C-alpha cells in the first residue's frame, strides 16, 4: 500500500527543558519548586517565573520558553491538515531530546496543565505510559531527519528566500514527504546545524506559531482540495 503524502513539521531547538544543574539552588527556582511541591530538578524551566535565575545561564535570554512549544502544538494538532491525517509533528529540544506526538493527541489548552504534562514526560519518557501519545527519545535533529527520510528539507529562516505562503504551499506539494523545520525559540539562530533550503514567508521576523500556521494552511490548500474534489 502506498504511503500517504504528509507534511512533517519539526519544532527545532525548542527552548523546552527541565531546570539545569547550575541554577538548581537559585532562590527563584527553589521557591517556585516549593510552591508546586516538586523537586527543583523535576520542574520545567520557564522564563515567566525563573527570569532572575536565567541571567546566570548561557543563552539565558532565549531559554525557558515552553509557551512557544505549547502554542505551536495546539495550532498544529487542531489543524485541518492534522485532522485529515496529512501531518506529523515533532519537537526537538535544545538538549537533543525529540518528542514524538501522535496525531490524535489532544493537549491541554491550559498552560499550567501543559507544563505538568511536560514535566511528566521528561520524568517518565512517555505519557500516558500505556498509550504513549507523547514519547521522548534522546536524539539529535539530524538523527530525526534521517529517521523521517524526507525527499526535501525546508528551514524557515528570516534570511531565507522570500516566498509568499501560497507559493510555498505549491512548492511543498511537489514532494511526497516534505519536512519543514521551524525554530522553537524566541530569537537568534538555530543551535543545530542542518542542511536544507532556507525559506522566509515575510519581510520581517515572525513568531514560531505564526510560521507554523502559515506553513500548515499553505499546504492544506494544495493537498486537501485534491481529496475533496
Curated annotation (Swiss-Prot):
The protein's enzyme class: transferase
Residues at which S-adenosyl-L-methionine binds: 183, 188, 201-206
Any GO MF annotation of the entry: rRNA binding
GO biological process terms held by the UniProt record: rRNA base methylation
Catalysed reaction, written as an equation: a pseudouridine in rRNA + S-adenosyl-L-methionine = an N(1)-methylpseudouridine in rRNA + S-adenosyl-L-homocysteine + H(+)
Nucleotide-binding found in the keyword field: no
CDD domains: Nep1-like
Site (Stabilizes Arg-65) residue list: 67
E.C. numbers: 2.1.1.-
Alphabetized SUPFAM superfamilies for the sequence: alpha/beta knot
The organism's place on the tree of life at top rank: Archaea
Keyword RNA-binding among record annotations: yes
Site (Interaction with substrate rRNA): 65, 106, 109, 113
Keywords annotated in UniProt: Methyltransferase, Ribosome biogenesis, RNA-binding, rRNA processing, rRNA-binding, S-adenosyl-L-methionine, Transferase
Task performed by this protein: Methyltransferase involved in ribosomal biogenesis. Specifically catalyzes the N1-methylation of the pseudouridine corresponding to position 914 in M.jannaschii 16S rRNA.
Family to which the UniProt record says this protein belongs: Belongs to the class IV-like SAM-binding methyltransferase superfamily. RNA methyltransferase NEP1 family.
Assembly: Homodimer.
Protein name according to UniProt: Ribosomal RNA small subunit methyltransferase Nep1
UniProt source species: Pyrococcus horikoshii (strain ATCC 700860 / DSM 12428 / JCM 9974 / NBRC 100139 / OT-3)
Taxonomic lineage from the root: Archaea, Methanobacteriati, Methanobacteriota, Thermococci, Thermococcales
Amino acid at each position: 500500500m502506498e504511503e500517504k503524502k504528509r507534511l512533517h513539521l519539526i519544532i527545532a531547538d525548542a527552548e523546552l527543558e527541565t531546570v539545569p544543574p547550575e541554577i538548581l539552588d537559585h532562590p527563584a527556582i527553589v521557591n517556585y519548586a516549593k510552591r508546586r511541591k516538586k523537586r527543583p530538578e523535576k520542574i520545567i524551566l520557564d522564563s515567566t517565573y525563573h527570569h532572575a535565575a536565567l541571567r546566570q545561564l548561557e543563552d539565558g535570554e532565549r531559554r525557558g520558553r515552553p509557551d512557544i512549544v505549547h502554542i505551536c502544538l495546539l495550532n498544529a494538532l487542531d489543524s485541518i491538515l492534522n485532522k485529515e491525517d496529512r501531518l506529523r509533528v515533532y519537537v526537538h529540544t535544545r538538549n537533543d531530546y525529540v518528542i514524538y506526538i501522535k496525531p490524535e493527541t489532544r493537549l491541554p489548552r491550559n498552560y499550567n496543565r501543559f507544563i505538568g504534562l511536560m514535566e511528566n514526560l521528561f520524568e517518565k519518557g512517555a505519557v500516558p505510559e500505556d498509550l504513549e501519545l507523547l514519547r521522548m527519545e534522546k536524539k539529535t535533529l539530524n538523527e530525526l531527519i534521517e529517521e523521517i527520510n524526507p525527499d526535501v528539507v525546508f528551514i524557515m529562516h528570516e534570511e531565507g528566500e522570500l516566498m509568499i505562503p501560497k507559493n510555498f504551499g505549491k512548492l511543498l506539494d511537489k514532494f511526497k514527504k516534505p519536512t519543514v523545520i521551524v525554530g522553537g525559540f524566541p530569537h537568534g539562530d538555530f543551535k543545530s546545524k542542518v542542511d536544507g533550503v532556507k525559506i522566509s514567508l515575510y519581510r520581517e521576523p515572525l513568531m514560531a506559531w505564526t510560521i507554523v500556521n502559515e506553513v500548515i494552511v499553505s499546504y492544506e490548500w494544495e493537498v486537501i482540495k485534491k481529496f475533496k474534489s
